[in-house]
Structures are given as structure tokens and as C-alpha cells.
From Swiss-Prot:
It comes from Caenorhabditis elegans. InterPro entries: DUF5354. This is Uncharacterized protein C02B8.3.
Amino acid sequence: MNAVQDAQDQLTKLIRCWEPIDSDDLSKGHTMSDPVYQLCSYMPSPKDYNKFHVNGVQMDSDDYTTILTMFANQLPGYAVLNVCLQEAFQFHKANHPSQVSLRCLCQRDGCNLPKTLTDFLDFNKGPIPAVNF
């Protein structure tokens, strides 16, 4: 099995995502959810890519139609593994800088590995091991 086959096999399944054990105290680590999600999220800290936030995506939190279409439009021998968006939000008046963040969405079981950004990207290069996380 390779990454393309793995992504294609999991395309229509509900997936498990890494989530914090305690969202108020990230030092308590992370746990794997039940298979209830269509997408997992990985967000590195904008100031330190060694820090991150991971969770399963609530599909009613935004319009994910375009993202889901990107994952679904697979060709023989091709699959989208992650979709990473650099987003800007204007929470203050226009003369203040926007808040910019990076958000990566993935659609395979346990794909939002709670590690550094580089480790997350490297992990997703191959098939995700079918083990009990």
C-alpha cells in the first residue's frame, strides 16, 4: 500500500482525529477520537511551528465544499493528502495588522499527527499505519 492507495481507500469513510485530552491544558497530551469526522485539522502556531493545535473538524463550522471536492477529485495514481490554507482575519480596525494563520486539513485516519509541522508533513507522505493509536 502507498499514500495514494491509502487516501483513496479512506476517501468515503468517517475518520479518527487526534484531539487534546484537555483543551485548557495541552500538556496532558492528545488522544484519538472515535471515527466520527470527515476531516481532521492541524494548525501550527503562527509564531512557533513546533507548537500546534489538532482536532476533528465540525462540518457545520464552515463551508468545506471546496475542500471536500479537492480530496474527491482523484485521478488514477493521484490523491490529495493535505490541503493547507494560509488565512488572514481582520479582528480590529483596518489600520491594525491582520491575524494570519496556517490551517491544514486532511482526510485519513489519524492524519493530524500532534507533532511539529515538519513531522506532520513527513508522516502524511506515506500510508498511515493501521495501528491502534
